[in-house]
């Protein structure tokens, strides 16, 4: 789970199923920038972040929970929508 469609609802490219750098990261870490895990921002934030591939409550491309864009984690259940969702 380190490329397209990371472990949990990442944007899809790069690596970082759990807090690693790159896009599509989704974990519970508190990083900032590319591949943020929890509450970060930028590409692939994990929880409450914003930008590409946020994991939970984020907004932008690939938000996971309650977000919008492509690569949402739950495209209909949690108010997110898009494509390339994993969970």
UniProtKB/Swiss-Prot annotation:
Tissue expression, as annotated, is: Strong expression in narrowly defined pattern restricted to the lower and middle cortical regions of the hair shaft in both developing and cycling hair. During hair follicle regression (catagen), expression levels decrease until expression is no longer detectable in follicles at resting stage (telogen).
Q: Which InterPro entries match?
A: KRTAP_type8/19/20/21/22, KRTAP_type_19
Locate the region 23 X 2 AA repeats of G-[YCGS]: 9-82
Among Pfam families, the record links this protein to: KRTAP
Q: What does the entry list under GO cellular component? A: cytosol; intermediate filament
The name under which this protein is listed is Keratin-associated protein 19-3
- The lineage's top-level taxon is Eukaryota
Q: What factors induce this protein?
A: Expression in skin and hair follicle is regulated by HOXC13 and by GATA3.
Q: What does this protein do?
A: In the hair cortex, hair keratin intermediate filaments are embedded in an interfilamentous matrix, consisting of hair keratin-associated proteins (KRTAP), which are essential for the formation of a rigid and resistant hair shaft through their extensive disulfide bond cross-linking with abundant cysteine residues of hair keratins. The matrix proteins include the high-sulfur and high-glycine-tyrosine keratins.
Q: What is the lineage of its organism?
A: Eukaryota, Metazoa, Chordata, Craniata, Vertebrata
- Which keywords does this chain's UniProt record carry? Keratin, Repeat
Query: Could you confirm whether the keyword Ribosomal protein appears in this record?
Result: no
Tell me the subunit arrangement. Interacts with hair keratins.
Protein family according to the UniProt entry: Belongs to the KRTAP type 19 family.
